[in-house]
């Protein structure tokens, strides 16, 4: 059982059960989903991520309360993290197609040289406690 203790009053804010099999299943499902993700064009991925950002931000009040309870940040300051998250996400999504496009390099000895960025696997982000949403972008 994982417990989150709120620094506000040192009580248990939430508890999450886990087991090894569920963790393994989650990783396995992530690997399967990543193959589908990699098959999408960058433009399609960008559209999906824009919807994700909108969906996340539609829960702003809930997230602000969670940030406050989990890390003790005053509720009046917690919304700034989500504003920063949106600014970063919007910027990264605005440059994604250009930055992830194929880079053609000069040919050498009848070889076509290029750099192609492709999604190659699943990653796990363990965000720092002080800016859990902002640093996820």
Locate the predicted segments by residue.
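Conserved small-residue-rich beta-alpha loop and adjacent elements
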Residues: 104-137
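N-terminal Rossmann-like NAD(P)+-binding subdomain of aldehyde/semialdehyde dehydrogenases
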Residues: 1-111
